[in-house]
Amino acid sequence: MNREHHILIIAKNTNGIVARIMSLFNRRGYFVKKMSAGVTNKEGYARLTLTVDGDKESLDQIQKQVYKIIDVVKVKIFPEKDVIRRELMLLKVKADEETRSQIVQIANIYRGNILDVSPKSLVIELTGDIEKLRGFIGMMSNYGILEIAKTGIVAMSRGEKM
């Protein structure tokens, strides 16, 4: 059965490594829904978290194929449990004198940060799991969403293991 899965890839941070990884997914016909990438605490290494749909067989195949890429040192399919997943969202919403305080109050309930205030809009930063972000988007849609920008999901295993 196809479900959404999160894949961790650790690779040497060499020129073109992200392009080579994404090219493999493209050539094999795997659709990457979301991607986030950055450096790790270990100098010279990059960390990618990809969100893909797939079943167990296709995930096993993806894992084997990615390991074949030179400079890839770790590939992990995150399990459903014992994993922390977060995404960052910036949301610009219409806000006038009448609605501004209501929007700020809702943002505070969701633990959002107000990054910009203008006469006709607010920009709010929110971090959380997908359900929290969806809930906030639903609340803000009543006021008129002007723009949304989201990162890909970042994920990390709970406990001491990677």
Question: What do the PLM-derived regions correspond to, one by one?
Answer:
Residues M1-R47, T51-M162:
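Long, contiguous binding/interaction regions
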